[in-house]
UniProtKB/Swiss-Prot annotation:
Pfam families (alphabetical): HMG_box, SOXp
Disulfide-bond pairs as recorded: none
Alphabetical GO biological process terms: brain development; entrainment of circadian clock; negative regulation of DNA-templated transcription; negative regulation of transcription by RNA polymerase II; nervous system development; neuron differentiation; positive regulation of transcription by RNA polymerase II; regulation of neuron migration
Protein purpose: Acts as a negative regulator of transcription.
Organism: Homo sapiens (Human)
GO molecular function (one): sequence-specific double-stranded DNA binding
Assigned keywords, A-Z: DNA-binding, Nucleus, Repressor, Transcription, Transcription regulation
Annotated signal sequence range: none
Keyword Repressor: yes
Name recorded for this polypeptide: Transcription factor SOX-14
Single GO cellular component term: chromatin
Principal subcellular localization: nucleus
Name of the gene encoding the protein in the UniProt record: SOX14
Length: 240
């Protein structure tokens, strides 16, 4: 590639004047040495020179600069290489991919001002929501009317004891939760056998005192009787 004819070289400075002869000499002495290594060694040697040793090369650089200004009075230095800061800036700038619009209303194909109208009209905005699993919406209290509450009360009057496997262990006779059927069938209430703090409505007969007595395990050793180790039975008989 040919160089442009209008390119004007810069005038040499003192280091370039000195290194011009030294580079040729060092390249002849070390033919396998790379040019960058030669430049490093020449720079280190230039710094070790005294001002008296540098003076002839400084004067020669001033003469060359004055001659260059006479030959090219309109010369302006224009670097062909980009500055290092611009190279670093261009190196780490990566274009970000377009991930699409994050607004779901715009992605649905709605006009620009449609989102404001949907916020002011809940009925319109509800059409874009997924269907709820519950039959009644928490946002519409009109659905909880008296007829809806009556429909919720229409449950079977008596559940079979086999449907609830723990009904027999709790002492229910006519159904596990038959009291949940209708208010007219609630004959009485009694404390729960498992938790006396709760009252259970039921249409069965009341529990007797013997059914509320917790079971007691006895361990009899030779020479011992049950009456001697049963303080609970004696205390219960005294209270009765």
């Amino acid at each position: 590639m040919s160089k442009p004819s209008d390119h004007i070289k810069r005038p040499m400075n003192a280091f370039m004047v000195w290194s011009r002869g030294q580079r040729r000499k060092m390249a002849q002495e070390n033919p396998k040495m790379h040019n960058s290594e030669i430049s490093k060694r020449l720079g280190a040697e230039w710094k070790l020179l005294s001002e008296a040793e540098k003076r002839p090369y400084i004067d020669e650089a001033k003469r060359l600069r004055a001659q260059h200004m006479k030959e090219h009075p309109d010369y302006k230095y224009r670097p062909r290489r980009k500055p290092k800061n611009l190279l670093k800036k261009d190196r780490y700038v990566f274009p970000l991919p377009y991930l699409g619009d994050t607004d779901p209303l715009k992605a649905a194909g709605l006009p620009v001002g449609a989102s404001d109208g949907l916020l002011s009209a809940p009925e319109k905005a509800r059409a874009f929501l997924p269907p709820a699993s519950a039959p009644y919406s928490l946002l519409d209290p009109a659905q909880f009317s008296s007829s809806a509450i009556q429909k919720m009360g229409e449950v079977p009057h008596t559940l079979a004891t086999g449907a609830l496997p723990y009904a027999s262990t709790l002492g229910y006779q006519n159904g596990a939760f038959g009291s949940l059927s209708c208010p007219s069938q609630h004959t009485h209430t009694h404390p729960s056998p498992t938790n006396p703090g709760y009252v259970v409505p039921c249409n069965c007969t009341a529990w007797s005192a013997s059914t509320l007595q917790p079971p007691v395990a006895y361990i009899l050793f030779p020479g011992m009787t049950k009456t001697g180790i049963d303080p609970y039975s004696s205390a219960h008989a005294t209270a009765m």
